[in-house]
């Protein structure tokens, strides 16, 4: 069963593409028809692609892969931030910084600076600074937070990118392609699908469409993390069962060892009895 329904996609306006004169011919396989100069996306393919992307994300996250949400267009900014936070992943929703992936070492130093400044602003030492210096530091912190706030805690480049509108996020796409990082993206009729690994053909301008698709990808990540926890619990249970089995085996071994010792002792007693008791009986017979 699909994770979204045809009705949900229609109500969200996911089928509306761009004007026919603005289309990318490579999107032809994903277009159903054209009406009043606007391309209509084939939602059957959208349904299938959402399911494929969902399964890919879920399974990847179960393998401890990390995801970066990217959506800097106005309609997507808040949705991307909210859903990325909900599923505990990273996001960029203000501006893609060139080199974020290909020159991550430099970006990482700026992320570290953001975290250090955040701690400093909350310290007593900061409160003792002149008001003017405090204001300057706060402005720098706000600027860093705006561009890098969604990357806090990111220690290495992400394993997967999920992008809203790859045409707008062209630099992010190029960097990911260069590093062979898989990309999932909502792809409208004016985009190039060839640079995307998991194409979700859909209207990438409508807020309701963006909300629907982004929330489903976040759900996939949450499900993957829950599956990872369940797997860990199952493996933990298996380990406990194995430990219990080992304990039982040890107890049995101890009992067998004790029985063997007892049997050996019994044999020794029998030998002693055979050796000494008959002669004692003979001596007693002689007395009588």
From Swiss-Prot:
GO terms for MF: structural constituent of ribosome
Gene: rpsB
An annotated GO BP: translation
Coiled-coil blocks: none
Any matching Pfam family: Ribosomal_S2
Stretch list, region Disordered: 267-288
Record keywords: Ribonucleoprotein, Ribosomal protein
HAMAP family: Ribosomal_uS2_B
Residues annotated as transmembrane: none
A GO cellular-component term linked to this record: cytosolic small ribosomal subunit
Similarity comment text for this entry: Belongs to the universal ribosomal protein uS2 family.
Identification of the protein by name: Small ribosomal subunit protein uS2
